[in-house]
C-alpha cells in the first residue's frame, strides 16, 4: 500500500489549508489517482488495523439496497450512526441509488443487476457504469455520496474498476473505500467468471482533517507489511446472495489501530 502512504505524504507536503462543511478544517489537494493490481494481494492497509468486518457488512448492506442502519447495528457496525435519524433512516443513499434509482417515468432502475448483465453479455461495452450521484435526491440524503461514480472494464479476461470519489477523508475513510471496492470487484468477477484486474481510485477533493495530522505522522512512521489474500469460500447464486461468512482474509498482519475523531 505504498500508493496510499505516498498520498498521505503528498497531502501533508502540498495540501492547501481549507475550511470545510464540518467546521474542522483540512489540508486538501485536488485530483489524485492510484492503481492497485488485485492480483498482487487484497489492498487492505497494513500500517494500521482496519475493521474489515465493518467494510464487509457495509458493502453487503449497500448491495441489499438498504438505507436504514438496522442491519448494521445488528452486526455491531457503527460507521453510519452519526448521520441516521431517530428511526435509523439515512434517506436515499448508496443502496437506494445502486439498486433502485428513480427514473422520471416512475421506473426503478437496478444499476447493479444491469452491470452484471452487461458484463456477461457485452463485456466490451464502455457504458458499464454505476452512479450514486442522483441530483434530484441529494437534498433528501443524510450525506451526499462521497464515492459517487464507478465504471467496470474487461480486458484479457480480467475485470477492472475505476471509482471517482468527489470527497475523500484520507486518514479514516479512504482505507475503507479502497477495500470495499476491491471486494466488490472480486465478487463481481466471480459472478461473471472473470479474473480480477486493477482497481483504479480517482479522488477529487482529497484531504486530511486538521485533527488527523498527528495520527497521519504516526502512520507514516510505520513500515508497510505484505498484503493479505482474499478468499471467497463459495459462489452464491447471484451478486446479492453473499453472506459475511463467505469471506476470509488470509495473512493480514497489520500494525495496531490508530484512533481519530470523525468529522460530521
From Swiss-Prot:
- Identify the EC number(s): 2.1.1.45
| Residues the entry annotates as binding (6R)-5,10-methylene-5,6,7,8-tetrahydrofolate | 51, 169, 263
Q: Which Pfam families match?
A: Thymidylat_synt
Q: Which InterPro entries match?
A: Thymidate_synth/dCMP_Mease (IPR045097), Thymidate_synth/dCMP_Mease_dom (IPR023451), Thymidate_synth/dCMP_Mease_sf (IPR036926), Thymidylate_synthase (IPR000398), Thymidylate_synthase_AS (IPR020940)
| Source domain of life | Bacteria
Q: Keywords for this entry?
A: Cytoplasm, Methyltransferase, Nucleotide biosynthesis, Transferase
Positions of dUMP binding: 21, 126-127, 166-169, 177, 207-209
Q: Which reaction does it catalyse?
A: dUMP + (6R)-5,10-methylene-5,6,7,8-tetrahydrofolate = 7,8-dihydrofolate + dTMP
Membrane-crossing residues? Answer: none
Which pathway is recorded for this entry?
Answer: Pyrimidine metabolism; dTTP biosynthesis
Q: Name one GO cellular component term.
A: cytosol
Q: What does the record give under GO molecular function?
A: thymidylate synthase activity
Q: Name one GO biological process term.
A: dTTP biosynthetic process
Subcellular compartments: Cytoplasm
Q: Does the keyword S-adenosyl-L-methionine apply?
A: no
Active site per UniProt: 146 (nucleophile)
- What protein family does this chain belong to? Belongs to the thymidylate synthase family. Bacterial-type ThyA subfamily.
Subunit arrangement? Homodimer.
- Function summary: Catalyzes the reductive methylation of 2'-deoxyuridine-5'-monophosphate (dUMP) to 2'-deoxythymidine-5'-monophosphate (dTMP) while utilizing 5,10-methylenetetrahydrofolate (mTHF) as the methyl donor and reductant in the reaction, yielding dihydrofolate (DHF) as a by-product. This enzymatic reaction provides an intracellular de novo source of dTMP, an essential precursor for DNA biosynthesis.
Task: Please identify the protein, giving its name as recorded.
Answer: Thymidylate synthase
Amino acid at each position: 500500500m505504498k500508493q496510499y502512504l505516498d498520498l498521505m505524504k503528498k497531502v501533508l507536503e502540498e495540501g492547501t489549508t481549507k475550511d470545510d462543511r464540518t467546521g474542522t478544517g483540512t489540508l486538501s489537494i485536488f485530483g489524485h489517482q492510484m492503481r492497485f493490481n488485485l492480483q498482487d494481494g487484497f489492498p487492505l492497509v497494513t500500517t494500521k488495523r482496519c475493521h474489515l468486518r465493518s467494510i464487509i457488512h457495509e458493502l453487503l448492506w449497500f448491495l441489499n439496497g438498504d438505507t436504514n442502519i438496522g442491519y448494521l447495528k445488528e452486526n455491531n457496525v457503527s460507521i453510519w450512526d452519526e448521520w441516521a435519524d431517530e428511526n435509523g433512516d439515512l434517506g436515499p443513499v448508496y443502496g437506494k441509488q445502486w439498486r433502485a434509482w428513480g427514473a422520471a417515468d416512475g421506473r426503478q432502475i437496478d444499476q447493479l443487476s444491469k452491470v452484471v448483465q452487461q458484463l456477461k453479455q457485452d463485456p466490451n461495452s464502455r457504458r458499464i457504469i454505476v452512479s450514486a450521484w442522483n441530483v434530484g435526491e441529494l437534498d433528501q440524503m443524510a450525506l451526499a455520496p462521497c464515492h459517487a461514480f464507478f465504471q467496470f472494464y474487461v480486458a484479457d479476461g480480467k475485470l477492472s474498476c475505476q471509482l471517482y470519489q468527489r470527497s475523500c477523508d484520507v486518514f479514516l475513510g479512504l482505507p475503507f473505500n479502497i477495500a470495499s471496492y476491491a471486494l466488490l470487484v472480486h465478487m463481481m468477477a466471480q459472478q461473471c467468471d472473470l479474473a480480477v484486474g486493477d482497481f483504479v481510485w480517482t479522488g477529487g477533493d482529497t484531504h486530511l482533517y486538521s485533527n488527523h495530522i498527528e495520527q497521519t505522522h504516526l502512520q507514516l512512521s510505520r513500515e508497510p507489511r505484505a498484503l493479505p489474500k482474499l478468499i471467497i469460500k463459495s459462489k452464491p447464486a447471484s451478486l446479492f446472495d453473499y453472506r459475511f461468512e463467505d469471506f476470509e482474509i488470509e495473512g493480514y498482519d497489520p500494525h495496531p489501530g490508530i484512533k481519530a475523531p470523525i468529522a460530521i
